[in-house]
Design a protein with these regions (language model features):
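A positional/architectural concept
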Residues: 1-13, 21
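C-terminal cap/substrate-recognition subdomain and adjoining C-terminal extension
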Residues: 11-16, 24-141
Length: 141
């Protein structure tokens, strides 16, 4: 799947990938199997995780990138430096993201498109091909 290749590209570019989701059953299992940190947000405002991410990952909010598709994502999108959404996000999110709407529907290689956009805009450095291929050999990927 192109999204898992994109996660490896992000990681090999030095970018920490984190799942933050209210859908814990499926996403937590996927994250665990792929060695991706997972935070469950059901019942908690997602922006409350900003301070956790700052201290845990030593990153400032304006350096963070977030992809979301529902109204529950708006509060955290307003606090991070880069907010993106899939093309089938709810209207409020599409309006907020305006120039950052990925031309993919959710679940259709959005992370692959996100990587391409972030790399082309110099938001992230180019990925390290050798590290990428080494990650591909890892049992968890």
């Amino acid at each position: 799947d192109k999204d898992f290749s994109a996660i490896k590209k992000f990681k090999s570019a030095g970018v920490k990938v984190i799942f933050l989701s209210g859908d814990t059953n499926i996403n937590e299992s996927i994250a665990k199997n792929r060695s991706i940190d997972f935070y469950a947000s059901r019942g908690v405002c997602k922006s409350a995780f900003i301070n956790i991410f700052k201290s845990t990952y030593n990153i400032l909010p304006d350096e963070m990138c977030y992809v979301g598709d529902d109204i529950f994502d708006l509060n955290i999108m307003k606090e991070v430096g880069y907010s993106f959404c899939p093309s089938n996000a709810v209207k409020t999110i599409r309006e907020y993201c305006c120039g950052n709407i990925l031309n993919r529907v959710g679940g259709d290689n959005c992370l692959d498109k996100l990587f391409d956009v972030c790399e082309s805009r110099n938001i992230i450095p180019p990925f390290d091909e050798e590290l990428f291929y080494n990650l591909d050999k890892d049992d968890k990927f």
